[in-house]
Design a protein with these regions (language model features):
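Residue-level recognition of single "structural anchor" positions
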Residues: 1-175
């Protein structure tokens, strides 16, 4: 017998690496007490202090208090950027008045939002993150939301010819 050619196992949802690996995308997220949020693709694999710096550079004021989980990358990021860090270790949700419930809620809403689309390509993930932030955390009037969304789409790279689709950058980053 000769076997029929078939797709590779990974394309059918098989063989993959467990845990944090280069198959997962690192998306650092931040939400402040006013409801402003920042999230953007940093890299593939486990998050690092350089990846955090890439996303949050210039967006967090000096001497700000950051509340995060026990990941060691936040410690290096806080030391390099003159920030105060409170880490909530695993199994706990708060330390005194500081908690990670706000960011956990953000992650839950983001997952629900992305589940609607049955998987999003990494190439377009930043655009979906912006869309989610405008819908969920844009604490502004509808007219302002529309102008923010219009500005984000107008500044995106748009190609008219179908031939140029393959020449687009793999991860469009909207600022």
């Amino acid at each position: 017998f000769e076997s029929l050619p078939s797709e590779q196992a990974r394309n059918r949802g098989g063989l993959h690496t467990r845990g944090l690996s280069d198959e997962l995308v690192c998306i650092p997220c931040a939400v402040d007490l006013k409801g402003n949020s920042v999230s953007r693709i940093a890299k593939l694999g486990k998050c690092s202090k350089d990846a955090l710096h890439k996303v949050f550079d210039g967006r967090i004021a000096d001497n700000t208090i950051i509340c995060s989980d026990g990941d060691s990358s936040y410690k290096g990021f806080a030391e390099n950027n003159n920030l105060n860090l409170i880490q909530v270790k695993g199994g706990k949700k708060s330390i005194k008045n500081f908690n990670i419930q706000r960011i956990n809620n953000y992650h839950g809403q983001l997952k629900k939002f992305l589940d609607i689309f049955n998987g999003v390509s990494t190439k377009y993930l930043n655009n979906y993150l912006i869309w989610n932030n405008v819908l969920m955390y844009g604490k502004v009037y509808l007219k302002n939301r529309i102008s923010i969304l219009f500005d984000a789409t107008a500044s995106a790279y748009i190609s008219i010819r179908a031939v140029d689709v393959n020449k687009r950058p793999t991860i469009p980053i909207l600022v």
